Amino acid sequence: MLFITGDCHGNFERFNPSIFPEQKEMTKEDYVIICGDFGGVWHKDEESPEETMVLDWLDSRPFTTLFVCGNHENFDRLYQYPVEDWHGGKVHKIRDSVLHLMRGQVFEIEEKKIFSFGGASSHDIQGGVLEPDDPEFEKKYATLSRGYLPFRINHWSWWKQELPSEEEMEEGRQNLEKHDNKVDFIVTHS
């Protein structure tokens, strides 16, 4: 079985058995794909105790959790996880059954070809992106905090990697060509 859901932003309540009873019949060979803004890897520098608890809980579900990146991910941390080959494409292995489907990959899952290409441009930064090492950071932060425009802080709540790199786009093109530019599904974030 293959299930697809949208943004979690670190809230995985929807995977409780009382809300998602279908999992009672699922195994690790069944998959739930989160279409970006996973949010399970968010704490600034290292895995927090809360993240450990949540990621271990996801890993204990009877299914395998897969996700593509959105625009609200901690890319500094996400890219530190080991890269492995899985079902024909590259993943970051967060836990044994919690995997980040990297951009530009073609996976064969449930006899279907799935092209993954996560990421998106943030829409919630009208106030701008602050640089934490800016000498005026505290002043700018205080000013923006009193205002009504949403803002982000570079490498705290915003990363330029929210958008794909040229290398990721080229790898995606090459992987699609290997499959004659034919896949069954495209999983992305919007």
How would you name each of these model-derived features?
Residues 96, 112-190:
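Active-site-proximal loop/helix segment associated with metal-binding centers of metalloenzymes
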Residues 1-3:
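Extreme N-terminal starter segment of soluble prokaryotic enzymes
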